[in-house]
Amino acid sequence: MSKKKETDSYLSSDIKKSKDFKIISNLLKINDAVIVSHYYTTPDIQAITEATGGKVADSLEMAKFGKNHKAKTLLVAGVRFMGETAKILNPEKIVLMPTLKAECSLDLSCPEKEFNKFCDNHPDRTIVVYANTSAAIKARAHWIVTSSIAIDLIDYLDRLGEKIIWAPDKHLGRYIQKQTGADILIWNGTCIVHDEFKSQSLLNMKKIYPKSAILAHPESPENVLNLADFIGSTSQLIQAAKSINQKTIIIATDKGIFFKMQQACPDKILIEAPTSGEGLTCLSCARCPWMKMNNINRIIKSLTNKKKHNEINIPHDLQKKALKPLMRMLKFSQKVI
């Protein structure tokens, strides 16, 4: 269940009286920087981000915010592909991360060499890749999407008669295919967090909370999605939690989302969806291990380190290639959001 008291402590104005806030605020001014954080980072990072004028958001809104903000330096708290996306969109800006070792299981599941071979074997197909991919994979794609616009884009391409390659998340790919009926070849990747949600355990929890609603991210397995009252991206799940009638909500996504979700609906009871069957040990336990690598001390070190060991750099040619499908994504998102 959500730790409401802990969340409330981060929501209070006391955060601005903390030593960390004063240090980070000063470093942000010195570096002409702003923090952009994902919903899956820890509550203290999300609170510091908002208190210093930064943005906590999903991948799409992170990209938009970083591109439109006047700061010369972006501190991206999330996983590596998010920092790369920020750099692709803002080659003139310095892009820092708390650590460059924060990977993503979806990104790792789609190696460049293997994916290029897969695409070469299907030259007649339009390549659509999830934002959770490396700069090299993005550069190979025709389109890039986040989960918030994936169905809209695939439906659009399907109406144009396009046959599609989708990578890397197989669960999201199957969900999109089911929703649109599009002709899609799906790469076999998964998210370490969402892949662990189990339908039987979810059914057992539903028996304990029979009046609850289930909200699920589409990176979850199909049998979990079949039990959900609402399926959507992180930002869409937060909106659903606000509008849904039930007071008790079971959440099948990374528990980092609870911070902003509890802000949005403080009267709701949020419960973590189970991540394993009885007697089994979970690997992620509804918390991305790489997102947890982001912490306040690393943010301070990244902003302090003048050698910029945690700076994202992308070769110019690769940046130019990856920028094209990213800009298509941003332009398309303006039409559907």
UniProtKB/Swiss-Prot annotation:
SUPFAM superfamilies found in the cross-reference section: NadA-like (SSF142754)
Binding locations of [4Fe-4S] cluster: 104, 191, 288
Annotated catalysed reactions: iminosuccinate + dihydroxyacetone phosphate = quinolinate + phosphate + 2 H2O + H(+)
Residues binding iminosuccinate: 38, 59, 130-132, 147, 217-219, 234
InterPro entries the UniProt entry points to: NadA (IPR003473), NadA_sf (IPR036094), Quinolinate_synth_A_type1 (IPR023513)
Subcellular location per the Swiss-Prot or TrEMBL entry: Cytoplasm
Coiled coil regions, renumbered to chain: none
Domain of life, per lineage: Bacteria
Its EC number(s): 2.5.1.72
Details of cofactor binding: Binds 1 [4Fe-4S] cluster per subunit.
Cellular component, GO, one term: cytosol
Broad class of the protein's primary localization: cytoplasm
Protein name, entry field: Quinolinate synthase
Gene this protein is translated from: nadA
